[in-house]
């Protein structure tokens, strides 16, 4: 319950993470080999999940991945790790993670969050979660305004990633 007496929405984040061997492929080149890209992707995901788990209204982070190293590292941070059972791309992984979150926690809000947000601050996520209102989805576009960094579905609203 907030200071105003209103019930605070509880949120569960869903974070899909590719297999590290496929991560950050756009950075491939002579100065960035596969091992370096994998370490970078894992560090990005770890930073993002750590910041998310420290946010006040966040009750859980569900990481959807088939990579055992990702699962181990993010599980050690406190995330729930589930296999990418759909194995059909980003949107099915997000929908599956949202289903897992609501099965475990009931009527929570769900946030689909990109794993590559290493500069995410807990205070920024707290602010964004507090700004979501009503019964509709909200989103935060990526820096290039061509994708989505976060997609918010309040309690009772389907995540419906597209």
Residue ranges: model-predicted function:
Residues 152-162:
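Short, glycine-/small-residue-rich phosphate/pyrophosphate-handling segment
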């Amino acid at each position: 319950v907030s200071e105003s007496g209103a019930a605070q929405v509880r949120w569960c984040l869903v974070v899909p993470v590719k297999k590290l061997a496929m991560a950050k492929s756009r950075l491939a080149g002579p100065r960035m080999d596969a091992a370096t890209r994998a370490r970078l992707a894992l560090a990005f995901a770890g930073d993002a999940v750590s910041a998310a788990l420290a946010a006040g209204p966040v009750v859980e982070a569900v990481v959807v991945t088939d990579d055992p190293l990702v699962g181990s590292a993010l599980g050690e941070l406190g995330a729930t790790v589930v296999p990418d059972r759909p194995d059909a791309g980003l949107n099915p992984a997000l929908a599956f993670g949202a289903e897992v979150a609501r099965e475990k926690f009931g009527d929570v809000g769900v946030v689909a969050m990109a794993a590559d947000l290493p500069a995410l601050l807990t205070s920024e996520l707290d602010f964004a979660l507090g700004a979501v209102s009503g019964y509709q989805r909200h989103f935060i576009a990526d820096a290039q305004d061509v994708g989505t960094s976060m997609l918010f579905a309040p309690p009772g609203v389907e995540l419906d990633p597209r």
